[in-house]
């Protein structure tokens, strides 16, 4: 159900989800399918279009969760399978693994999918739920809560037409802040992020695939330089280059041709290919990276989910993976709390998920390939945390309502 009926200026529901990305939509969908009434409120007038956005890597456990939601066919049709990682150092191969090598993984590949495609697939499923209401063009501006419920106040966003009420109140048993790093709902409940910025930027270029290469994530680490090549739909590749400090200014000024020249020593085949397809690449984009945490994942009846409460380096696509898995954990906790009347399940959401997410953050923060260290790499960039990404602790699997630690 989707509505902008001005008569609905006051709503009561089991769960109110604030946000409009894949994390918010997925959490709302799980709650609705579990039998709860759900109101999702997005501050923007429109959701991201299918095919739009970046194409992060969805890991096998996340794909298993999304497949159970009925959107597997859409994701597979629009996405690109990634079979594993080959990681090269200055003296040769540091590590090589495939998802299929990890015993028990039901789905032996990751999938890079445009974020807009995931959003639209989840949105269609959510709108089909009889107890779900989707509202757009309204920003959260107030929150009040007691032991029984939380009341959220919304205002019509600038530029919205009169079909949306100027103000609206939604009373819910629980609320979910899934509105991203700049979360308005998180700010309203008084939670501030603790941000740690990586001191090393990188530069992104999207180009057609080098012919004949296997669909794996390639890492070439020639300290302090590092090159990451990620298969994306197209077929194309996202080329992420972290140069030495003294190469950065030249890269800012030189664009794709300069990037191709700089990587010649690290990946001569790709360098030559970029020269061949120079008119078919994207512009070069500078990327900055950071991690962020929050001192608490919950304030009373408001739960913080996804990038509203944690952020990771883009390496391996773990930001979206952990956000979607967090939405599943939160939805399960809310369902148990509503069914039993016992808020202990809400406390378990943070207790079980938080150590897993922060372990990934710590591994990324200390990863040699993401810094300016000049010592030759002795381990693959993904080697230390492939198991953390794919083999989930049993208690976390139970919270996700899965049946296998390597779903």
Curated annotation (Swiss-Prot):
The keyword Oxidoreductase is assigned to this record: yes
Domain of life per record: Bacteria
Catalyzed reactions: protoasukamycin + NADH + O2 + H(+) = 4-hydroxyprotoasukamycin + NAD(+) + H2O
Effect of disrupting the coding gene: Mutant does not produce asukamycin and accumulates protoasukamycin.
EC code: 1.14.13.215
Entry-linked Pfam families: FAD_binding_3
Cofactor, how bound (note): Requires a flavin cofactor. Displays no significant preference, and FMN, FAD and riboflavin can all be used efficiently.
Protein keywords: Antibiotic biosynthesis, FAD, Flavoprotein, FMN, Monooxygenase, NAD, Oxidoreductase
GO molecular function: FAD binding; monooxygenase activity
GO biological process, one term: antibiotic biosynthetic process
Cofactor(s) listed: FMN; FAD; riboflavin
Gene3D superfamilies: FAD/NAD(P)-binding domain (3.50.50.60)
Activity regulation, per record: When flavin concentration is low, activity is enhanced by the presence of the NADH-dependent flavin reductase AsuE2. In the presence of abundant flavin, activity of AsuE1 is not affected by AsuE2.
Function according to Swiss-Prot or TrEMBL: Involved in the biosynthesis of the antibiotic asukamycin. Catalyzes the conversion of protoasukamycin to 4-hydroxyprotoasukamycin. Can also convert some protoasukamycin derivatives into their corresponding 4-hydroxyprotoasukamycin derivatives. Can also use NADPH, but catalytic efficiency is 50-fold higher with NADH.
Record note on quaternary structure: Does not interact with AsuE2, suggesting a possible transient interaction between the two enzymes instead of formation of a stable complex.
Protein name (database record): Protoasukamycin 4-monooxygenase
Organism expressing this protein natively: Streptomyces nodosus subsp. asukaensis
Lineage: Bacteria, Bacillati, Actinomycetota, Actinomycetes, Kitasatosporales
Gene that encodes the chain: asuE1
């Amino acid at each position: 159900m989707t509505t902008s009926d001005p008569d609905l200026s006051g709503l009561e529901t089991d769960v109110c989800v604030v946000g409009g990305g894949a994390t918010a939509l997925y959490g709302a969908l799980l709650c609705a399918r579990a039998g709860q009434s759900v109101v999702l409120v997005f501050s923007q007038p429109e959701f991201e279009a299918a095919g739009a956005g970046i194409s992060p890597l969805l890991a096998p456990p996340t794909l298993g969760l999304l497949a159970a939601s009925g959107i597997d066919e859409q994701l597979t049709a629009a996405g690109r399978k990634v079979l594993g990682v080959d990681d090269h150092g200055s003296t040769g191969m540091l590590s090589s693994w495939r998802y299929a090598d990890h015993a028990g993984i039901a789905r032996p590949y990751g999938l890079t999918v445009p974020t807009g495609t995931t959003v639209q697939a989840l949105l269609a499923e959510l709108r089909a739920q009889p107890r779900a209401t989707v509202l757009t063009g309204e920003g959260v501006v107030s929150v009040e809560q007691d032991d029984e419920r939380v009341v959220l106040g919304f205002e019509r966003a600038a530029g919205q037409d009169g079909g949306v009420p100027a103000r609206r109140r939604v009373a819910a048993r629980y609320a979910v802040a899934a509105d991203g790093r700049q979360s308005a709902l998180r700010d309203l409940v008084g939670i501030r992020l603790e941000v740690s910025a990586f001191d090393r930027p990188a530069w992104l270029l999207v180009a057609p695939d080098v012919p004949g290469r296997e669909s794996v994530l390639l890492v070439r680490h020639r300290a302090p330089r590092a090159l990451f090549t990620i298969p994306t739909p197209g077929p194309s590749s996202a080329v992420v280059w972290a140069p030495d400090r003294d190469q950065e200014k030249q890269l800012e000024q030189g664009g794709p041709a300069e990037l191709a020249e700089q990587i010649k020593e690290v990946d001569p085949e790709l360098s030559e290919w970029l020269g061949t397809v120079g008119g078919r690449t994207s512009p070069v984009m500078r990327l900055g990276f950071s991690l962020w945490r929050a001192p608490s994942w919950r304030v009373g009846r408001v739960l913080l989910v996804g990038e509203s409460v944690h952020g990771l380096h883009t390496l391996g696509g773990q930001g979206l993976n952990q956000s979607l898995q967090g939405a599943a954990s939160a939805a399960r906790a809310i369902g148990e709390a509503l069914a039993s009347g016992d808020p202990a399940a809400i406390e378990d959401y943070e207790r079980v998920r938080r150590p897993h997410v922060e372990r990934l953050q710590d591994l990324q923060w200390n990863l040699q390939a993401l810094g300016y260290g000049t010592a030759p790499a002795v381990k693959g960039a993904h080697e230390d945390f492939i198991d953390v990404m794919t083999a989930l602790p049993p208690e976390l699997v139970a919270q996700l309502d899965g049946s296998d630690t390597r779903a």
